[in-house]
């Protein structure tokens, strides 16, 4: 499950409700779930109802690459409708082979997954036809009363691939039922969400050499949502929503003479049908986005190279005002022995995005979720200074950044409206530092991270006694992932996180937390295709609330086996 794989990634903050695979928001650099985008190949994936559902990507991890986290200028050029950052996946090359896994744990947890890939021995034009299929299943009663979840996912893909490029035709279907106390609201009720997500993608990428490439794609997505605020009460009744998205995108890098031209374009058409989100001005919207940023380089003395990039991004919809956002980056590469960093860079990137329908079309004057049809385009300016380096088995990155956002749509709580959560625009400045070090060895892997954040917020005339999202952030966060290959087939993985959260009136369990997960695996030396695992999540049984007022999942264990062929 793609979101679960990000749980202890130092560049990403996963805010889970129950297990990450049940429901989780993904935040980057102190942003919120609505300011995080997702890409698969050349297309930007999106749910127009709410950013909660943009992370519902019905694709097996075996079909996707490891994610790249885009921030700053990279996000401004390669992201879409995401002012903080983008999780970018590529389509993995199919290989002949497969795997099957099954596991069980406490709270009547069981899970299973299967994958099979085939590559045809017959080729044409230097490329071969391949196909793969996958399925995943998971059920649990949950670690809290009325905390059950059910998950099903099925995938099929055709691929034509060779040394020069790759074409993928993918279909995914996913169903997910989640129930949890205070799933989205702080009113001590049992809420549930029942989702059905379909995704059809056609993507092509052609490698041109020297770092140049061209990629293009198109997709269709449908998400059906059945939300119940109070499972144990008669009112209010359920809410039903269906969204459709049709999108196309292209991106690339082409070198002509001394200039390399970085470009991208996206078109997305969305539609909402809902029995409650009916108070806005529209329920369809067309989005257009294009970016162009040429870059050039100069060789300097001492094995150094200076690269300058400058360009702009154009965003428009048929419902909102358009915006032109400048992007610039200056990078100094240093290949001299003994240099502290392989690259030093400074960048400035402006970006913009528009609100989703839950914020725009919820009833403004009554109800549990209060919307505002007048919410406008959200704008951000990001300035960043950073470095990258690698020596021997170590690699590291460091960045200091400042993001100034105007009109960010947050959901707030006010004692003057104790029975509602309200969509409100906020002007917010975020200053942060981000440090990551990675070590890869024969017996040991380490991933160490630190993030420090500070925010200054202005809600204008809105009465905001607490923020569900924009002011739910760690002032300090340390992560440490340790993988030990102990020999004779044994491997131990420890994922750890320590955080000091910004105080929040809605969080009732404290603002400091130490969270850990451990997995022990064994591969018999004479049967390397088999892997046995035992894992514990929330090892210290912490009650820290990732999302304010949402109870934490308790300690859970699972044991299983994976067979590969």
Across the structure, where does each feature detected by a protein language model lie?
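Surface-exposed extracellular loop regions of Gram-negative outer-membrane beta-barrel proteins
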Residues: 115-140, 174, 218-228, 260-269, ...
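Outer-membrane beta-barrel signature, preferentially recognizing the C-terminal barrel domain
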Residues: 184-210, 241-243, 343-406, 414-440, ...
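Gram-negative outer-membrane beta-barrel transporters
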Residues: 297-308, 395, 401-404, 423-505
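Flexible loop and strand-edge segments within Gram-negative outer membrane beta-barrel domains
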Residues: 140-151, 165-247, 277-278, 282-283
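C-terminal beta-signal and adjacent terminal beta-strands/loops
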Residues: 501, 520-565
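Short acidic/polar hinge/loop motifs at secondary-structure boundaries
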Residues: 43-71, 85, 89-91
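Short strand-turn segments of transmembrane beta-barrel domains in outer membranes
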Residues: 68-74, 85-120, 135, 139-148, ...
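Extracytoplasmic beta-strand/coil segments of soluble accessory domains associated
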Residues: 4-47
């Amino acid at each position: 499950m793609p979101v679960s794989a990000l749980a202890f990634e130092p560049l990403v903050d996963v805010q889970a409700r129950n297990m990450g695979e049940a429901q989780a928001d993904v935040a980057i650099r102190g942003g919120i779930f609505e300011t995080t985008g997702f890409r698969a190949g050349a297309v930007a994936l999106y749910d127009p109802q709410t950013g909660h559902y943009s992370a519902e990507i019905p694709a097996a991890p075996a079909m996707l690459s490891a994610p790249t986290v885009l921030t700053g200028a990279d996000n401004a050029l390669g992201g879409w409708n995401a002012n903080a950052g983008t999780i970018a996946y590529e389509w993995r090359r199919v290989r002949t082979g497969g795997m099957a896994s099954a596991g069980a744990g406490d709270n009547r947890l069981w899970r299973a997954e299967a994958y099979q890939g085939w590559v045809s021995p017959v080729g044409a034009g230097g490329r071969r036809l391949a196909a793969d299929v996958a399925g995943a299943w998971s059920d649990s009663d949950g670690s809290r009363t009325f905390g059950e979840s059910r998950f099903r996912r099925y995938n099929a893909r055709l691929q034509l691939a060779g040394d020069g490029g790759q074409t993928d035709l993918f279909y995914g279907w996913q169903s997910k039922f989640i129930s949890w106390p205070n799933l989205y609201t702080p009113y001590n009720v049992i809420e549930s969400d029942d989702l059905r997500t379909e995704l059809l993608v056609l993507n092509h990428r052609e490698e041109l050499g020297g770092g140049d490439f061209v990629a293009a794609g198109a997709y269709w997505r449908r998400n059906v949502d059945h939300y119940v605020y109070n499972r144990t009460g008669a009112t209010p009744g359920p809410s039903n929503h269906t969204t459709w998205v049709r999108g196309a995108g292209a991106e690339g890098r082409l070198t002509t003479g001394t200039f390399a031209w970085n470009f991208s374009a996206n078109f997305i058409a969305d539609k909402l049908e809902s029995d409650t989100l009916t108070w806005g001005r529209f329920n369809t919207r067309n989005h257009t986005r294009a970016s162009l940023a040429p870059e050039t380089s100069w060789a300097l003395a001492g094995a150094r190279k200076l690269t300058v990039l400058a360009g702009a991004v154009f965003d428009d919809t048929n419902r909102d005002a358009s915006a032109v956002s400048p992007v610039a980056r200056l990078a100094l590469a240093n290949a001299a022995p003994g240099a502290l960093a392989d690259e030093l860079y400074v960048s400035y990137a402006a970006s913009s995005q528009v609100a989703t329908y839950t914020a725009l079309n919820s009833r403004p004057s009554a109800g549990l979720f209060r919307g505002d049809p007048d919410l406008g385009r959200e704008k951000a300016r990001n300035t960043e200074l950073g470095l990258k380096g690698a020596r021997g088995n170590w690699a590291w990155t460091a960045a200091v950044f400042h993001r100034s956002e105007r009109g960010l749509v947050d959901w707030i709580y006010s004692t003057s409206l104790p029975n509602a959560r309200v969509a409100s625009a906020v002007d917010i400045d975020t200053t942060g530092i981000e440090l990551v070090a990675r070590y890869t060895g024969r017996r040991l892997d380490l991933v160490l991270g630190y993030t420090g954040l500070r925010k200054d917020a202005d809600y204008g005339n809105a009465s905001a006694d607490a923020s569900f999202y924009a002011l739910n952030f760690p002032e300090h966060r340390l992560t440490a992932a340790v993988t030990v290959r102990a020999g004779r087939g044994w491997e131990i993985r420890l994922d750890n996180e320590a955080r000091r959260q910004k105080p929040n009136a809605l969080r009732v369990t404290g603002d400091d937390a130490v969270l850990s997960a451990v997995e022990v695996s064994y591969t018999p030396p004479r049967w390397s295709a088999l892997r046995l695992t035992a894992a514990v999540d929330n090892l210290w049984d912490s009650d820290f609330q990732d999302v304010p007022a949402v109870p934490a999942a308790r300690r859970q264990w699972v044991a299983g086996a994976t067979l590969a062929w």
